[in-house]
Amino acid sequence: MGQKINPIGLRLGVNRTWDSRWYANTGEYGKLLHEDVKIREFLTEELKQAAISKIVIERPHKKCRVTIHSARPGIIIGKKGADIEKLRKKLSEMTNADTSLNIVEVRKPEVDATLIAQSIAQQLERRVAFRRAMKRAVQSAMRLGAEGIRINCSGRLGGAEIARMEWYREGRVPLHTLRADIDYGTAEAKTAYGICGVKVWVFKGEILEHDPMASERRAVEGDNQGSSSNRRRENA
């Protein structure tokens, strides 16, 4: 089942945590969930060029806190913080609550699965050869500390008559191992021949302690190399 299931969902509560972190009163859950979907769709569309990795939504008492993980925080903040203030006001109108907006920089976008998938999708739209795009992404990730990476591209690759799936892997990607810190991301490339799908799995090592926040803390700190205290590396 580890081959089929979303690797982030499989590890929730083990070494990953949820991207929406709030509790709802009876009857409010559906409304707040729909609100979260609208917030994510709005920010993803509004900040296409900002290389957004993920959006975390928290709801303290009658407030809303949105944290955007981005490889290009300067695009979101704008000149003297003007753009981020406009975004905050729009989000406050959408949620009807006092909304705060935080930006977290992704220090190593080359090992972030979502950003890798977005990059490959953009290259496919620019008619870059899919094998070259995949190989370049794999080499960059391995050079910057990933222990393994797998990339799947599917669709009418290269304008072929029949859709197919091509994949490229380097290193280890142990999908069944729950303690493995595996990042997963997807993207769509809208090409002249139709939509091509991109899936990326990045293995960043093993998290030995039981801590649902461990993976996020490591990503924020840029500690993708890991340390001997919380990660076990396999000997070659």
Curated annotation (Swiss-Prot):
Pfam families: KH_2, Ribosomal_S3_C. Residues 214-236 are annotated as: Disordered. This is Small ribosomal subunit protein uS3. NCBIfam families: rpsC_bact (TIGR01009). GO terms for molecular function: mRNA binding; rRNA binding; structural constituent of ribosome. Belongs to the universal ribosomal protein uS3 family. One of its GO terms (cellular component) is cytosolic small ribosomal subunit. GO terms for biological process: translation. It comes from the Bacteria. Part of the 30S ribosomal subunit. Forms a tight complex with proteins S10 and S14. The gene is rpsC. Keywords: Ribonucleoprotein, Ribosomal protein, RNA-binding, rRNA-binding. Residues 39-107 form the KH type-2 domain. SUPFAM superfamilies: Prokaryotic type KH domain (KH-domain type II) (SSF54814), Ribosomal protein S3 C-terminal domain (SSF54821). Gene3D superfamilies: 3.30.300.20, Ribosomal protein S3, C-terminal domain. Binds the lower part of the 30S subunit head. Binds mRNA in the 70S ribosome, positioning it for translation. Disulfide bonds: none annotated.
